Amino acid sequence: MENKKKMIFNVLFLFLVFVATLYGVFHGEDLSEIAEILKTVNLYWLFPGVVCVIIFIWGESIIIFYMMHTLGIHLKKWKCFLFSSVGFFFSCITPSATGGQPAQIYYMKKEKIPIPVSTLVLMIVTITYKMVLVVIGLGLMIFGRGFIRTHMYDIRHIFYLGTGLNVFCVASMLLLVFHPVLARSILVKGMELLEKMHLMRHKSTRIEKLNASMDQYHTTAVYLKDHMMVLVNVFAITLFQRFALFTATWFVYKAFGLSGTNAFVIILLQSVISVSVDMLPLPGGMGISEKLFSMIFEPVFGSTLLIPGMILSRGLGYYTELLISAIFTIVANFTIGRNLRKKA
């Protein structure tokens, strides 16, 4: 019952944010003019953009397949693609993408994959996923100051905030993995402080859950110490995966027949948006992503093509991802665990 209420809340929240985003983007705009501009788009340039989205989803499935193999669990690649699709679908519709991994663990459990194993794999996926954003963010802050001044000066503060939040997130996860005793001490003291301030009720079961979590982090630490090259390989795949999705915006740029801005700048600007919004509590960064796009891509697309460009870029980067992952999540519902049920 509680899960149903949570799902209803997430769907309603997604709908409200979507409506607010539509209003914010199109209020005061000439919709007929935008529609006419969209009709002039070269569709052949959009097909590679869709391929970029598929590569993005496929990339995580390769990571899951690869890591499961190192743990002695042999899965078919198409099942890993379904696990990946489930994760992206629920991440797209929940605030801060919180619903993705619990859903993946649920579907993996249906395939008789032990929860500690699926938790380990998905934790490493999360760490490397965030690490790519940290590398982009810190790389620009240290080596790309000229780029920041030239292309994204007006949004630099939210970019710094997004980078800082991602650094904090990755640092926290690495602390939990490699220093679980210290992390446990910090968390216990933090909970005691919140209880004293009456911001949290005392629950004895909370410590038990914390201890169980620490065991999982310890397992991850042991695995990483013995498989450092696996982490390096996963990071490389994740880097390729993320930049494949960022590249979709360049194909949108070419679909309008534009030239003058090189692919590197467009792809990097799209990555800046991802770094900035990734940790914000909005499904798919909806609303704020559109705002940032309009601020940093106007010199690239021009004022006339800015909103049509935004529609296609977000259409590929978020809504196409949502649609594709939704379709394969439905497939997962009918196929994951099916053979096991037949044998039973």
Short names for language-model regions:
Residues 32-40, 108, 213-225:
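A short amphipathic helical element positioned immediately N-terminal to and/or at the very start
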